[in-house]
Design a protein with these regions (language model features):
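ATP-binding N-lobe of GHMP and related small-molecule kinases
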Residues: 1-99, 117, 121-126, 163, ...
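Solvent-exposed alpha-helices and their adjacent loops that cap or buttress functional pockets
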Residues: 35, 133-134, 140-143, 159-164, ...
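Short, conserved aromatic-histidine micro-motifs
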Residues: 59, 126-142, 268-284
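Conserved, helical-rich catalytic subdomain that frames metal- and/or nucleotide-binding sites
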Residues: 144, 149-245, 260-270, 277, ...
Length: 285
C-alpha cells in the first residue's frame, strides 16, 4: 500500500460575469480567479485491497460517490485504465463549505494531481485540467492554480500574471446560498453593472494592486445581497476599517477583502471574529 499527500487550495473570484445560459443547461462565465493559501489536506491510500472509501473530519460532507474527490479518483482511474486495488481518501477540511471558495473542487483537483504523480505523470497539467472538467466546473482551475482567466463553464483557462503582493481576509457568514436558485435569479433579471475583465487583466499585467482593487466585481453579489442584508453589514465593517476592496466570491456566501500587509489583515480579522467564527487570513499563491 502507498499513501499519497496533496494540498487542496481554495480559490477566490476577483471578477465574475455570467454571459448567458447555454443549450446544455450550463452558463457561460468569464472570471479572473485566484488561488489562495487556505487549504484542505488530502491523503490517499492506494492498494488497500478493500472497497473504495472516503473519510472527512467535518460533519455534513458526503463520504461516498457524491463527493467530488471520490468522483475525481473514479474519472482518473477510468480514463487511464488503472486498477488501484482499493482506494481510501481522507480529507482534512479547512476550506469552509458553501462559501464560493471551491472547496470540493479543490479536493477533487488535489486527488487528480496526486494520482497523476503516483502513476508517473502520464498527463500534462493541461490534460489533467481537461479531465477535471468531467468532475466539476471549477476543477480545471483548481488543478492549474495561480491566477487565470476562466471562461466557458470553467473549462477554458488562460494563465495571467501573478497577483501583486497582498493579503486576503475572508469572512464566511452562517447562511449559505443555493447555486441553482442563484443562477435562476440571474437568468430572470437584467444585469446592470458587469466586471471590466480587460481592466483587471491590465492591472495584473502592470502589477498594480490599487487598480486590481478598483476592478474587483462579481455579478452575483447584488443578487445575493438583496436576499441577505448581512453581506452589506460585513462589507460596511470592512469599509469602516479601510479595506482597499471587498466583494463576495463565487456564488457566496463568503466575502473577502484585500489589504496590503499582514498586520492590517490581523486587525480586520480580529474585528470580524467578534461576530463571525469563520474568518481566514490568506495569501495569493
Amino acid at each position: 500500500m502507498t499513501t499519497l499527500y496533496e494540498g487542496a487550495f481554495a480559490k477566490l473570484n476577483l471578477t465574475l460575469d455570467v454571459l448567458g445560459k447555454r443549450e446544455d443547461g450550463y452558463h457561460d462565465l468569464q472570471s479572473v480567479m485566484q488561488t489562495i493559501s487556505v487549504r484542505d489536506d488530502i491523503e490517499i491510500d492506494i492498494g488497500t485491497g478493500k472497497p473504495w472509501c472516503l473519510k472527512c473530519d467535518k460533519e455534513g460532507i458526503p463520504c461516498d460517490e457524491r463527493n467530488l474527490a471520490w468522483k475525481a479518483a473514479k474519472v482518473y482511474c477510468d480514463a487511464m485504465k488503472k486498477d488501484p486495488d482499493g482506494i481510501e481518501i481522507r480529507i482534512t477540511k479547512r476550506i469552509p463549505s458553501e462559501a464560493g471558495m471551491g472547496g470540493g473542487s479543490a479536493d477533487a483537483a488535489a486527488v487528480l494531481r496526486a494520482l497523476n504523480r503516483h502513476y508517473g505523470e502520464p498527463l500534462s497539467i493541461g490534460a489533467l485540467a481537461e479531465l477535471g472538467a468531467q468532475v466539476g466546473s471549477d476543477v480545471p482551475f483548481c488543478v492549474v492554480c495561480g491566477t487565470a482567466m476562466v471562461e466557458g463553464r470553467g473549462e477554458k483557462l488562460r494563465k495571467l500574471p501573478d497577483m501583486p503582493d497582498c493579503i486576503f481576509v475572508i469572512c464566511k457568514p452562517e447562511f449559505s446560498v443555493s447555486t441553482p436558485e442563484l443562477y435562476k435569479k440571474i437568468d430572470e433579471c437584467t444585469i446592470g453593472k458587469r466586471p471590466d475583465n480587460r481592466a483587471m487583466e491590465s492591472a495584473l499585467l502592470a502589477g498594480d494592486l490599487e487598480k486590481v482593487c478598483q476592478n474587483v466585481y462579481n455579478v452575483f453579489d447584488p443578487v445575493v445581497t438583496a436576499d441577505h442584508a448581512e453581506l452589506n453589514y460585513i462589507k460596511s465593517l470592512l469599509h469602516q476599517y479601510g479595506a482597499a476592496a471587498y466583494q463576495m466570491t463565487g456564488s457566496g456566501s463568503a466575502v473577502y477583502c484585500i489589504v496590503e500587509n499582514f498586520e492590517y489583515a490581523a486587525v480586520i480579522c480580529s474585528m470580524l471574529r467578534e461576530n463571525y467564527p469563520q474568518v481566514f487570513i490568506a495569501k495569493p499563491i
